[in-house]
C-alpha cells in the first residue's frame, strides 16, 4: 500500500473514531416530543390485596437529537407502581437522556387497597414526563374488586356444606372439597386460580337467572393478546367434579343459567352405581373453552337442554 493510500485510510478511520466519540446533541427544542406505544393503560378487574399482572409499553424518541427528560412524576395516589428501564424509585427518575431513535421500557402494575364496598371501584392516575419546558402524559385506569378468598392448607379446603352468595365474587385458590350440599346463589361469580378444582360429594344447586347468571371462570382478568382476553383461554383451572358418595339417596345436581368457562374440564359427573343413579338437570347453561372435556357424564340420569 502506498504512503498516500495509508494516509487517506488513516484519515478516514480517524474521522470515524472522532465522530463516534462525540456526545449526542441534546436538544432543548420544545417542539420535540416523545412517542408512546400506548397513550393510556387500562387494567381489567384487579382483585384487591392481590395485585395485577405487569403491563409493558415503550417510550420512543423519534427525533434525530437526544432529549433530556427532566423528571417523571405520578400525579395521583399510590395505587400504581412503575419501572422505567430498570428504575423503580420515582424520585430517581430524573435527568434521563434518551438518544435520538432510542427507546425505554416502561412497566406498570397496580395493587388496590381493600374497599368497604362490594361493587367494583374505579381508580386512575397519570404518569407525567417533563421535558423541554413541556410535559407529556400517560393515563392509567383500573377497576378494583373486593373478593372473598377461599384458601385451604396443603392445596385443599374441605367443607361439610357450603352456600356461596352473590354479595361479592369468590376467589378459589385451592381444590375445594364439599362433602355435603353445595349451593350457589344467582348472580354469583367464582374465580378459579390456576389448578383449582371443585369436588362435590352431595347435592349441588346452582340456579342462576337470565338477568343474574352464575359465572365460574379462571382468575386471569388481563389479556393474552390485545384482542384476546384471558377469560376465553382454556386450561386456566382444573374443573368441577361431581362424585356420588354412595349414600342412601342419590345426589341431585341442578345447573340453570350457569356459564362455566376456561378450565381443563368443565363439568365431570361420575357414579359407580349403574342402578341408583344421580340426577342432573343442566339447562340454559354454557360450558365452553375447556382444554380437555366440556361435559362428561358416567352413570348419570341427565336432562341437558337450552
How does the language model describe each region?
Residues 18-20:
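C-terminal motif of bacterial Sec signal peptides marking the signal peptidase cleavage site
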Residues 25-27, 34-45, 50-52, 56, ...:
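Beta-strand/loop edge motif enriched in small/polar residues
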Residues 59-63:
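Asparagine-centered strand-capping/turn motif at beta-strand->loop junctions
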Residues 1-8:
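Bacterial N-terminal signal peptides that target proteins for export
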Residues 73-92:
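Short, solvent-exposed loop/linker segments at beta-strand-coil boundaries, enriched for Pro/Gly
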Residues 52-53, 64-69:
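Short acidic/proline- and small/hydrophobic-mixed sequence motifs that coincide with surface turns
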Amino acid at each position: 500500500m502506498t504512503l498516500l493510500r495509508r494516509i487517506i485510510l488513516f484519515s478516514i478511520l480517524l474521522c470515524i473514531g472522532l465522530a463516534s466519540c462525540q456526545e449526542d446533541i441534546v436538544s432543548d427544542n420544545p417542539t420535540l416530543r416523545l412517542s408512546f406505544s400506548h397513550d393510556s393503560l387500562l387494567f381489567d378487574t384487579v382483585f384487591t390485596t392481590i395485585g395485577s399482572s405487569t403491563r409493558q409499553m415503550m417510550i420512543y424518541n423519534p427525533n434525530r437529537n437526544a432529549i433530556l427528560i427532566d423528571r417523571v412524576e405520578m400525579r395521583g395516589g399510590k395505587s400504581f407502581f412503575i419501572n422505567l428501564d430498570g428504575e423503580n424509585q420515582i424520585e430517581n427518575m430524573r435527568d434521563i437522556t434518551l438518544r435520538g431513535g432510542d427507546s425505554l421500557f416502561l412497566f406498570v402494575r397496580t395493587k388496590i387497597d381493600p374497599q368497604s364496598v362490594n361493587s367494583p371501584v374505579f381508580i386512575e392516575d397519570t404518569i407525567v414526563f417533563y421535558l423541554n419546558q413541556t410535559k407529556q402524559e400517560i393515563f392509567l385506569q383500573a377497576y378494583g374488586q373486593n373478593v372473598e378468598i377461599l384458601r385451604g392448607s396443603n392445596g385443599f379446603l374441605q367443607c361439610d356444606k357450603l352456600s356461596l352468595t352473590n354479595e361479592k365474587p369468590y376467589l378459589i385458590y385451592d381444590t375445594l372439597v364439599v362433602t355435603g350440599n353445595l349451593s350457589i346463589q344467582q348472580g354469583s361469580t367464582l374465580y378459579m386460580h390456576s389448578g383449582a378444582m371443585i369436588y362435590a360429594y352431595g347435592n349441588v344447586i346452582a340456579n342462576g337467572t337470565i338477568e343474574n347468571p352464575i359465572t365460574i371462570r379462571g382468575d386471569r382478568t388481563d389479556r393474552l393478546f390485545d384482542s384476546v382476553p384471558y377469560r376465553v383461554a382454556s386450561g386456566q383451572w382444573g374443573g368441577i367434579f361431581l362424585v356420588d358418595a354412595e349414600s342412601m339417596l342419590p345426589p341431585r345436581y341442578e345447573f340453570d343459567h350457569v356459564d362455566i368457562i376456561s378450565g381443563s374440564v368443565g363439568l365431570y359427573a361420575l357414579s359407580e352405581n349403574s342402578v341408583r343413579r344421580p340426577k342432573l338437570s343442566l339447562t340454559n347453561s354454557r360450558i365452553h373453552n375447556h382444554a380437555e372435556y366440556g361435559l362428561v357424564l358416567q352413570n348419570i340420569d341427565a336432562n341437558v337442554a337450552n
